[in-house]
Amino acid sequence: MFSMILSGLICGALLGFVMQRGRFCLTGGFRDMYIVKNNRMFYALLIAISVQSVGVFALIQAGLLTYEAGAFPWLGTVIGGYIFGLGIVLAGGCATGTWYRAGEGLIGSWIALFTYMVMSAVMRSPHASGLNQTLQHYSTEHNSIAETFNLSVWPLVAVLLVITLWVVMKELKKPKLKVATLPPRRTGIAHILFEKRWHPFVTAVLIGLIALLAWPLSEATGRMFGLGITSPTANILQFLVAGDMKYINWGVFLVLGIFVGSFIAAKASREFRVRAADAQTTLRSGLGGVLMGFGASIAGGCSIGNGLVMTAMMTWQGWIGLVFMILGVWTASWLVYVRPQRKARLATAAAN
């Protein structure tokens, strides 16, 4: 038990620290792809996926890890991924983003985290068993893309690496925009860790390595998976309500560690502030959390479980879930940002 607690907390704290300092926000990244046509954060996600994919399949080939992709619940993945995408825009962050922003002191993220936790737990209760069983009927035999085409997984990993290297090199060749910065207050390692602006691609490499580390640490405790946010988040509430130790696992300490790591990073970099939410933000965050919990539960994963881990494992669930997650973000971005701005411009033009 002690080793499970320690390894889960350390892995989570590393992830929370890196995501907070690197401002690694997939919600903002997917939104920017649509609104400002900026794909940098998506390319960063591809880097993290690639690093993890190469590492995990190397460990599997060496006989150090085991993994079965199972069946592909396509209907739940499509519907859930889209709903989750809608929810993360309203909540102001994805599942992991909500955890690390709660560690920064954002009350809106606390609200989103609570409703996300409640809905995730509800979706694992007998009340949702009928819906879950119905969605499970709409599945295909193979979740693994390689198994579907009777291929080795390595050609797929190679294609991912080539695409990732190409888009990253293309992005790095673009002219750099100068960003105004304040004079540094710190020097050396303290400046790098707590003050210097982190490049998203460097952050992505670190996240990929942490995601890789999560596999052996998690499997050592009997949990045969890597990073995962939704189920452990639900497990916290299930344990608090039922008091049953069966809900305590490595993933629970992972998500608690994300909060701790983010808090440490925010305090050390002087970015921690308790920021209250107005009525509109409160309602939007609460609704966003509900949609996140519902969507991630029926999709079988969130932006980390499907978007980072299952994509790295070369599964249909990961890549198709990611596509519909992005489509959900774009739809919500149009409703929340683009449409109101367009209406405001038209009203201004009419007034003039």
Curated annotation (Swiss-Prot):
Changing residue 302 to S: Cannot complement a cysPUWA-tsuA deletion mutant. GO terms for cellular component: plasma membrane. GO terms for biological process: thiosulfate transport. Its main location: membrane. One of its GO terms (molecular function) is thiosulfate transmembrane transporter activity. Induction: Member of the CysB regulon. mRNA levels are increased by disruption of the rppH gene, which encodes a RNA pyrophosphohydrolase. Changing residue 27 to A: Can complement a cysPUWA-tsuA deletion mutant. It catalyses: thiosulfate(in) = thiosulfate(out). Changing residue 306 to A: Can complement a cysPUWA-tsuA deletion mutant. Changing residue 303 to A: Cannot complement a cysPUWA-tsuA deletion mutant. It is found in: Cell inner membrane. Changing residue 292 to A: Cannot complement a cysPUWA-tsuA deletion mutant. Residues 66-70, 124-148, 219-247, 311-317 are periplasmic. Mediates thiosulfate uptake. Belongs to the TsuA/YedE (TC 9.B.102) family. PANTHER family: INNER MEMBRANE PROTEIN YEDE (PTHR30574), SULPHUR TRANSPORT DOMAIN-CONTAINING PROTEIN (PTHR30574:SF1). This is Thiosulfate transporter TsuA. It comes from Escherichia coli (strain K12).
